[in-house]
Regions:
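A short acidic/small-residue loop/turn micro-motif
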Residues: 24, 53-56
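A short, polar/charged loop-to-alpha-helix boundary motif
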Residues: 56-68
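Short, aliphatic-rich beta-strand segments
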Residues: 15-20
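Short loop/turn motifs at secondary-structure junctions and domain boundaries
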Residues: 27-31
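Cysteine/selenocysteine-centered motifs that mediate thiol-based redox chemistry or coordinate metal-sulfur cofactors
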Residues: 70-91
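Short, acidic, Ser/Thr-enriched surface-loop or helix-capping motifs
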Residues: 10-11, 40-41
Length: 91
């Protein structure tokens, strides 16, 4: 699910963003106050994540990289898919 993961950390707003592949139309699913998963409208799979307050999730900010995004995408991806699928049923 996370092969080819690219990431960027914006320290001025403390947001770690990660994505797979090229940008495409997505639906965003907030799984908690600081994590948003992006679901592809084409493949119906998680293709990105935004992590607000990313530095709070790790002790050393030098470790804010793709491994944190990859771990959180694996952790929250299934819940995001459930939320997304439920929301599509009610449209």
């Amino acid at each position: 699910m996370t092969d080819g993961l690219q990431w960027d950390y914006n320290c001025s707003v403390d947001v770690l963003s990660a994505w797979i592949g090229t940008p495409e139309p997505c639906d965003e699913v907030a799984v908690d106050d600081s994590v948003v998963i992006r679901i592809s409208r084409k493949t119906y799979q998680p293709v990105g994540i935004d992590i607000r307050f990313a530095s709070r999730r790790i002790r050393w900010t030098g470790a804010l990289d793709g491994s944190l995004a990859r771990a959180l995408l694996h952790q929250h991806g299934p819940a995001a898919m459930n939320i997304w699928q439920t929301s599509r049923l009610h449209r």
